Amino acid sequence: LSSPSLTDCESPARAPGFRLSGSPKAEEVIMPSIIETTVYAFDELSDSAKEKALDWYREAGLDHDWFEFVFEDFERVCDLLGTEIRTVPVRLHGGGTRRKSCIWFSGFWSQGDGACFEGDYSYKSGASAAVRSYAPQDGELHRIADALAAIQRRNFYRLRARLTHRGRYHHEYSMAIAVERRGPCRQDMTGDAEEAVSEALRDLARWLYGQLEREHDHLMSDETVADAIRANDYRFTEDGAHVG
């Protein structure tokens, strides 16, 4: 006897696991796995693991605005010396604007690193005494204040200067400094006035860079970084890799 043939309307019975060619595969269900590991506090690590933990924090843990305190101090010094830092409006993420001081720096590894700023300088009575009162131990600031006072005295306290940033680098020589003598008689300033004022203001930018570099070195020191790690209770693997 011949086997019965299938008609167009009939389908063969499918055995378990049978799949027609072209039909989608069932998605595999991947179950999550749990991995247990031992974590350590900073002081429980070996010396080599501590070095790795310190390096991690130096790269990831430093606040992006760590220099704001130095900028605020610098603006205070500028005010005492008679220099008004220029500000520009910047938009806030939540709406509105705030004023941002025109102070810049780059550092601290390349030969061209430094700091610069924009603003207007003019004579301010009692600047030398005010600077000494504010920073009694800072001989460099005293020297800058005295240099500005001396050149102002020779020009009857009528010198003014405008400082603007130029180029894409940030150091004392990326500032254009225009010095002039103002007054009703339109007298010429002394021959050394422009150089003396410019050099004193560039020294002020150098002083700012030194303050930034010292603050950065302090924040990156082993002791300060270790204290920050302890305060935040960060945890690490045995070889010093951060966990979390």
Name each model-derived stretch.
Residues 20, 27-244:
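Alpha-helical propensity feature that highlights long, continuous alpha-helices across diverse contexts
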